[in-house]
């Protein structure tokens, strides 16, 4: 994200390459490619004192230093906040932890599914049709944390620009994900003495099978619920004040369930295209449930020119999305560049003042690759 907004991002990894990179064909895994586009790659052995010294020299020239080791690891490597701050007092230093730098879980290993589970997100996916909850099949904790990190870094840079100087930022995945999930996921726990809602989607907000597929809809206003009854030909419910107003439906759990059942039954007898066309005409938010391969040919996706295809020198054709934010004066740059391990090592060392002989010496010692 920061690279797409113009930052020169340097990815530091071990001389042999990080594990995620090594799983793909020709050392290009799709997930790695999607997460590391537009970065320059430097391979450094951080267990070597020369590697540590090199990193401190590099940090002295940078605006931002980001790490996601477990708590205490960077201090042992000689690259903790105080060490980096000594090299560059104005540095914005961001540590990304699983649970935080302190507390009962701080030393535990953690990955995305664990954070999903411990934030209540997994339990929130249960429904009458799926009594046993399930994981969200995307790295939602990782990505919400990444957005939080990017936002925090830009805020710290703005504060520095206004005279605050450099600073340390801690972003635990637990905190970032819970804050991201909270507005709707914990709406019934926000106020004191809440009434805990059942673990199911509201009956005005559902995914439903049609004759030939699935659609999702959201009826949120009186006008929309009345439009739904017109789409389904339910004049009886359209005329009933208990069923044609959202407030009346929401006051009675049994009534809300009856609304959901009526909508399900009506939509089940229709084709997907007809449902979408008629709901759209009534101003009801709705859409088809697309397979991922179908997304590529969706008319709006194609119109927005979201997906870009380009050729990687070893992996071949790749598809990736453009930067989502469209700036009128300072547009983001799509950088179809995914560096191989250590691809830019010599270039970066040269910028630090190392000559060819010094670089060769570091390579020979295994400090860089």
Show the residue positions of the predicted features:
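A short glycine-threonine-serine/GTX helix/turn-capping micro-motif
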Residues: 134-144, 196-205, 214-216, 247-248, ...
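Flexible, small-/acidic-enriched active-site or ligand-binding loops
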Residues: 315-361
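Glycine-rich beta-alpha junction loops
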Residues: 16, 98-100, 173-178, 212-214, ...
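Substrate-binding/catalytic subdomain of NAD(P)-dependent oxidoreductase enzymes
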Residues: 156-195
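Short Gly/Pro-enriched turn/cap motifs at secondary-structure boundaries
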Residues: 32, 195-200, 205-207, 254, ...
């Amino acid at each position: 994200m920061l690279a797409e907004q113009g930052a020169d991002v340097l990815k530091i990894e071990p001389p042999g390459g990080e594990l995620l990179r090594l799983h793909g064909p020709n050392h290009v895994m799709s997930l790695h490619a999607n997460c590391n586009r537009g970065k320059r790659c430097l391979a450094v052995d951080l267990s070597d004192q020369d590697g540590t010294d090199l990193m401190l020299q590099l940090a002295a020239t940078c605006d931002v230093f980001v790490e996601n080791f477990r708590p205490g690891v960077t201090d042992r490597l000689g690259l903790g906040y105080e060490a980096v701050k000594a090299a560059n007092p104005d540095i914005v230093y961001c540590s990304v932890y699983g649970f935080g730098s302190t507390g009962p879980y701080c030393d535990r290993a953690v990955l995305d599914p664990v954070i999903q589970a411990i934030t209540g997100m997994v339990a929130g996916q249960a429904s009458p049709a799926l009594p046993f909850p399930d994981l969200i099949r995307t790295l939602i904790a990782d990505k919400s944390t990444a957005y939080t990190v990017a936002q925090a870094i830009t805020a710290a840079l703005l504060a520095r620009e206004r005279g605050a100087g450099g600073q340390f930022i801690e972003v635990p995945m637990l905190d970032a994900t819970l804050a991201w999930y909270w507005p709707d996921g914990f709406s019934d726990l926000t106020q004191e003495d809440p009434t805990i809602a059942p673990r199911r989607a509201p009956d005005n907000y559902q995914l439903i099978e049609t004759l030939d597929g699935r659609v999702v809809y959201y009826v949120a206003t009186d006008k929309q619920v009345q439009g739904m009854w017109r789409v389904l030909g339910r004049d009886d419910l359209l005329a009933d004040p208990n069923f044609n107003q959202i407030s009346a439906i929401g006051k009675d759990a049994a009534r809300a369930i009856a609304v959901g059942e009526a909508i399900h039954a009506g939509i089940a007898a229709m084709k997907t295209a007809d449902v979408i066309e008629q709901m759209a005409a009534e101003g009801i938010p709705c859409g088809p449930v697309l397979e991922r391969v179908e997304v590529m040919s969706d008319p709006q996706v194609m119109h927005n020119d979201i997906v870009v295809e380009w050729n990687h020198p070893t992996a071949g054709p790749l598809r990736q999305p453009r930067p989502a934010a469209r700036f009128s004066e300072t547009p983001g740059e799509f950088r179809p560049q995914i560096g191989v391990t250590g691809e830019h090592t010599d270039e970066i060392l040269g910028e630090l003042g190392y000559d060819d002989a010094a670089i060769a010496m570091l390579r020979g010692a295994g400090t860089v690759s």
